[in-house]
Every structure is written in C-alpha cells, then in structure tokens.
Swiss-Prot record:
It is found in: Cytoplasm. Belongs to the phosphoglycerate kinase family. HAMAP family: Phosphoglyc_kinase. This is Phosphoglycerate kinase. InterPro entries: Phosphoglycerate_kinase, Phosphoglycerate_kinase_CS, Phosphoglycerate_kinase_N, Phosphoglycerate_kinase_sf. Its main location: cytoplasm. The keyword Kinase applies. Monomer. It comes from Psychrobacter cryohalolentis (strain ATCC BAA-1226 / DSM 17306 / VKM B-2378 / K5).
Amino acid sequence: MNFLRMSELSLTDKVVLIREDLNVPIKAGKVASDARLQASLPTIKMALEKGAAVIVCSHLGRPTEGNPEAIYSLAPVADYLSDKLSAPVTLNSDYFTQGVAIEAGEVVLLENVRFNEGEKKNDAALAQKYADLCDVFVMDAFGTAHRAQASTEGVTQAMHKAGKTACAGPLLAAELDALSLALETPAQPMLAIVGGSKVSTKLEVLHSLAELCSQIIVGGGIANTFLAAQGHSVGASLYEADLLDTAREIMGKTEILLPEYVVVADKSDIDFADFTGSLQQASATIKSVDTIGENDMILDIAPDSAIKLAEAITKAKTILWNGPVGVFEVDAFGQGTQIVAEAVKNSQGFSIAGGGDTLAAIDKYQVADGVSYMSTGGGAFLEFVEGKVLPAVAALEINA
C-alpha cells in the first residue's frame, strides 16, 4: 500500500494531531478495559521521541452531536494516558474556540470528536478546523478507518488541500501490513475460522474467504445454518432458513469444516432475557449432529470434534480468525473455543485475529503470545477482509 508513514517523518517541533481509537468502556469514571489505549501508546510515545507537540483525538460512544454529555467525556482516558505516559495529559474541551496551546514534548487530548456537529457526516468545514490545529495529521485508528468522518477521512483531504502532511501511524500501518500479508499474498494452505450468530452478518466475509482459503471452520449460529444446509436437524438452535442455498453455494467453493459432535442445552432451561446467565445453570449435553432433538440448542463444538478441527489449524500456513465457535462466556459451552484458540497459538503458521469477541476469547484463554497479529478493528477488520475500500486509508493513499 502506498501511503506515508509517521515513522518515516521528521517531527521536530511539529504540532502533530493523532487520530486514535480510544473508544473504551468507562465504569464509575474509570477505564474498564484498556486494550485499545495500550495499543495507542507506542504511537504517542514515538511522536514525543521525535520531538513533536502531540494532540490526540478520538470518539467515545455514541453521543448526540452538539450535546456534550459527561458520560461520553474522554476525561477518564486523559487520566489513564497521564498515568501511562508519566506526564500530564490535558483534556481540552474548547479547542476550536480557544485553540490548543502546546509545546514540543507535551500531550493534549481533545474532548470527544463526536460532540462536534458534522463529525459523522464528514462535514468539510469541521474537517478543516481539525487540519488548522496541526502541521501533521496522523491517522492511527484502524477501528474507524471504514468510516468517512471529519476526524478520519475529511481531515486528510483538508490537509492535502492546505499542502500539509497526512500519514499513517504505526498502529494503522501494522494493521494494514498484517492484513495485506494474510489476504493478498497468503502462504498456503490458508484456513479461516469464522464464528458468530448469523451467516447474514458474515456473508460477504465468507464469500471472500471462500476464494482464498483451502478450508473454513465455521462455528456458532453460522455453523447451524451450514449443518441445516447439509440436511441435519438443528432443533431449536439459531439458524437462517433463508440462507441454506447460500450456505450450499459457499460449500461448493471451498471445504467447510463442520463438527460431528456438538454441545447442546434444552431450550426450556434457557431464559432469553438473561441468556448467558441462565446458561450458567443449564445442563450441557454432547450429541451427534445426527441426533439433535427438537428442543436442543447447539451452543458449542464438542471437545472431540474441536480436536479434529484443531488438527487442520495446525497444518495451515495462514490462519484468519474472526469469531468464537461457541458461547465461550459460559465455561460449559466454551471448550470448543478454547481448543481452537490453543490450536491457533500452537500453530507454526502466520495467524491474524480480529473482532471484539475473538479478542475476548484470546484474553480468556491466555493465548495472545501465540497469535501473530491481533487486529484492533471490528467493522474495519471485516470490511478489509471483504475487499472493501476503507475511506480513511484510501484518502492517505491518494495523498501520499
């Protein structure tokens, strides 16, 4: 990919605006999960080491534009960054009216960009205001690269029109390099693991991967649809009857690996208003896919079947993982995902994992050190796999 990289630039005494993805859960005024913040730190530190004055911006949650609600404030993130950088990080809420007073070696965090009217609509005037704050713009938020918004794509266009520099940060560049390696020039055989509740949400991903992969392991509700397409009864399990022909079409393109044995619970034991909570008390039973009863809900891949699937994983040279293969939040229905996770860890192939549930599973089963690359993106990860253009990245390429 042809774009400027922050690592290649001289930033001495430059005011640098870095768009990060700092959209993290906040509970009781504190950061509840810091994975995205940890991922942003190397970029901020690199800019400081290069002698820059660093302005950081991000969104948090989904506030109503023009209505700055305290629950969506980035104040807890500023506190977190201050602690991790061992230096004060000032939160600036009036950056357009008062400007940003900053010197080299300092860090200022702009208040939630989604408080600004026109952010989501990629308002050109708003994008220009961001560009006016800096000498160099750094797009480092892969998780929002699929959105053409004022602080992601519009600001790059504004920088270009003003004759200023816009570039990719180290995190964004690493994401794109890893995904390109996995999707454009993958070592074969390539295998994908695709989980989730519905085929419809991963339909384009499955079609794209079917062209690349020798084998695809499907799990969760997606697997139920493929099992039904093979003529198996799936009982009371979640599946999509209107996509059976689509599932068969995908099976005609590549080898879809399905379990022979699954873990089920009786539908009557499940409170759908408290799904995972009620599953804690439900009985888990292993059954052949040929003996699923009308009240059975398939909730995991049985261990023996998961071990067979793991054998395929260990033989792959490239592995792409998106989605758990069972309700791993409940231990009785998590063994399949655990076995798959450990197989990815122990594989000698290049592995890339993405999606919030996937990263949560990696964290739960402590296999991160065996995964070659973990993508911070959710929707952006899927859209890249689908072959779609990411607007914020395209703007960087055009203006390189």
